[in-house]
Amino acid sequence: MAGTIEKKLASSGITLPTPASPIANYVPFVRSGNMLVVSGQICFGGDGKLVAKGQLGGAVSIEDGQKAARACAINLLAQLKAALGDLDKVARVVRLGGFINSAAGFVDGPKVMNGASDLMVEVFGDKGRHARTTVGVSALPG
């Protein structure tokens, strides 16, 4: 039976994908006590294709970047479900970190990262409010 969070996702039209397997020498998540840390996610959509490809401030618009960040957050939720079995077990989203593929001079990474942050609040309510780091980089895998 789906929990409250999964019902909320379903009512929003969000289907969690099969969690991605690691592409190098790391694990998808680590649990230490009551803290769960999830490895970085790539912006694959439900169809298995990249939601956006290219640099923000170049070929990718802020709106498409936000969609990509949201896709990463959905993939993060899939990893959480794999780790916990039930998303209702999430007591709090503590921190999100986002690496934004950015052209030189692009400074709106925080606006892009809102695509992920907004989803956490949409799904978890006040428990989804979190600390955050957003870093612009010149290239990313994928």
List PLM regions with ranges.
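Short, polar/acidic, helix-capping and beta-turn segments at strand->helix junctions
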Residues: M1-G142
